[in-house]
Design a protein with these regions (language model features):
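Membrane-helix boundary elements
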Residues: 3-6, 14-41
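Core segments of alpha-helical transmembrane spans in multipass integral membrane proteins
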Residues: 16-20, 40-62, 75-85
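Membrane-helix boundary connector in multi-pass membrane proteins
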Residues: 85-102
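Membrane-water interface at the C-terminal end of transmembrane alpha helices
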Residues: 108-129
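Juxtamembrane helix-break-helix junctions at the cytosolic face
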Residues: 57-70, 91-92
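Cytosolic, membrane-interface loops and tails of multi-pass inner-membrane proteins
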Residues: 29-35, 126-133
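Residues within membrane-spanning alpha-helices of integral membrane proteins
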Residues: 7, 11, 48, 73, ...
Length: 133
């Protein structure tokens, strides 16, 4: 595993989550224990497009960041950490629950750890191009 792969995993997961939020909005929100309304579906679909966009940015960052990839890895780790903080807040206040919330929490913690670990590697040990894999 390398930092480029972590970016691809993060990007892929965000694109899949975004697609589910965009095309199966009611099911996704309902599985998190939310009361689905037409207004919430609109917000959920907006989240879906945003998640797809973040996934695309993450996927492409590993190709275009070059030697700055570790710095971007730290930034994306912080982005994922913000999502974890929000999930924990929603759990504590009872605004969301159910298996999807816990799955997102565990996956998010793993991603933060991977971004942190691989961003801390020596620049010489970070695989940046496909030729080096």
């Amino acid at each position: 595993m390398n930092l480029k792969l972590v970016f691809r995993i993060f990007g892929g997961l965000n694109m899949v989550t975004g697609a589910v939020a965009l095309f199966a909005t009611s099911e996704m929100l309902g599985s998190a224990g939310m009361t689905v309304t037409p207004q919430l579906i609109t917000v959920g679909q907006g989240f879906g497009v945003t998640a797809i966009a973040l996934g695309l940015v993450s996927w492409r960052t590993s190709d275009i960041a070059g030697e700055s990839l570790p710095a971007y890895g730290q930034l994306f780790g912080i982005v994922q950490l913000l999502q974890i903080v929000l999930i924990v807040y929603h759990l504590m206040t009872g605004q969301a629950g159910g298996p999807p919330v816990y799955i997102n929490l565990v996956v998010g913690i793993v991603l933060v750890a991977l971004f942190y670990f691989y961003s801390q590697q020596d620049d010489n040990s970070v695989i940046i191009s496909d030729d080096e894999e």
